[in-house]
Regions:
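Hydrophobic alpha-helical targeting segments used for export or membrane insertion
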Residues: 1, 16-19, 59, 188
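N-terminal secretion targeting segments of exported proteins
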Residues: 1-9
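Short, cationic interaction patches enriched in Lys/Arg with P/S/T/G and frequent prolines
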Residues: 8-38
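Catalytic glycan-binding domains that act on GlcNAc-containing polysaccharides
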Residues: 29-197
Length: 197
């Protein structure tokens, strides 16, 4: 009965996204029982609009990188929507950065040591991240914590530098027109998916 009650909490867009990946709300509920710390426990309490964003971003992730496992895509999308709102940044920005940085691969590691979906440099930011509940460098490979780290940094850079282009240059580690163009193109694509005319 508890599983059926939880099913009703999910917006139809979430149910449709799950179905498109061969899953159901019951599969999600069973997964949540095994993962008590997941941000997806909050999914049923997200507004209908935010649940629709999670569904749209999940489909975007799977569409751009089908090798991302269905639950990883849903966790990543849930984290992108949740932490973008928490840190006051547009979800299409955080999603575009994750796509550009790693193609949504939570195990990605750059040759410079950037890790996870958002390609965060643990050795540079560990103090800030630990102060915000991201305890170890292995947390960078958890899609939800990796997204939390990236959104936190993007928010700080936007606040410090006053614009998205300057924040992206800082996030990237230097000025790069090519990087900004990639992120900007992806932002436009994601924005049109999330906010169709």
């Amino acid at each position: 009965m508890a599983i059926e009650a939880r099913d009703a909490e999910y917006h139809q867009s979430i149910k449709d996204a799950l179905r498109s990946m061969g899953l159901s709300p019951k599969d999600l509920t069973a997964w949540l029982l095994r993962h008590p710390e997941s941000i997806l426990h909050k999914l049923g309490s997200f507004s209908a609009d935010d649940q629709r964003k999670v569904a749209t971003v999940t489909r975007y992730i799977r569409g751009t990188n089908p090798s991302v496992a269905p639950m990883t895509a849903l966790r990543t999308a849930g984290a992108l929507v949740y932490y973008s709102a928490k840190y006051g940044i547009p979800v299409h920005l955080s999603t575009a950065v994750a796509h550009t940085e790693s193609r949504f691969d939570p195990k990605a590691v750059s040759n410079k040591g950037a890790m996870g979906i958002m390609q965060v440099m643990w050795r540079v930011h560990n103090g800030l991240l630990q102060a915000n509940g991201i305890a170890t460098k292995d947390d960078m490979f958890n899609p939800e914590k990796g997204v939390a780290a990236g959104c936190l940094l993007l928010s700080r850079y936007i606040n410090a530098y006053g614009s998205i282009p300057k924040a992206l240059a800082r996030y990237y580690g230097g000025s790069s027109t090519a990087y900004f163009r990639k992120v900007n193109t992806k932002m436009a694509n994601i924005r049109s998916s999330i906010y169709p005319q």
